[in-house]
Design a protein with these regions (language model features):
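Extreme N-terminal starter segment of soluble prokaryotic enzymes
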Residues: 2-6
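A glycine-rich helix N-cap at a beta->alpha junction
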Residues: 56-83
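C-terminal structural segments of small proteins and small subunits
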Residues: 86-119
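Short glycine-enriched, charge-decorated loop/helix-capping segments at active-site entrances
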Residues: 53-58, 94-96
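Short internal beta-strands
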Residues: 26, 38-44, 77-81
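Short, glycine-rich nucleotide/cofactor-binding loops
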Residues: 7-22, 50-55
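Histidine-anchored nucleotide/phosphate-binding helix
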Residues: 19-32, 40
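Small/aliphatic-rich secondary-structure junction motif
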Residues: 32-50
Length: 119
């Protein structure tokens, strides 16, 4: 039976491991449940997770690669438009597969999905 999972991430890509752990769980859920629908919604400082080309030290996790892997598995990445704009993210290309979204869409996803997790 198909499950619908919404994961909301609020923290910046680096500094804490909330974005890392949210994306790690998202990737694992899709790997283990290929019939599930999964959406990651990036809010607040997490909107910066969708900026491509961020450099990380060798051996350190890379949020862009994690997002791309999630999209390849069929997951969707939504970025809060007002959160992105408040952080100067406008008129730039987002990580491949990420798309701008709204609070209205987040509200609909929250009401319609089976599970909602926050990081």
């Amino acid at each position: 039976m198909e499950k619908q999972v919404l994961i909301i991430i609020n923290d910046a890509p680096y500094g804490t491991e909330k974005a890392y752990n949210g994306l790690r769980l998202a990737n694992q859920l899709l790997k283990d449940n290929d019939d599930s629908e999964l959406v990651v919604f990036l809010m607040a400082d997490a909107a910066t997770c969708a900026i491509p080309g961020q450099k990380t030290p060798n051996g350190f996790y890379n949020i862009e690669r994690m997002i791309k892997a999630l999209v390849l598995k069929g997951g969707r990445i939504k970025v809060c438009t007002s959160c992105a704009e408040a952080r100067g993210i406008h008129n730039i290309q987002l990580v491949e597969g990420a798309e701008l979204s709204t609070m209205s869409e987040l509200a609909k996803l929250t009401m319609n999905f089976d599970r909602v997790l926050t990081f």
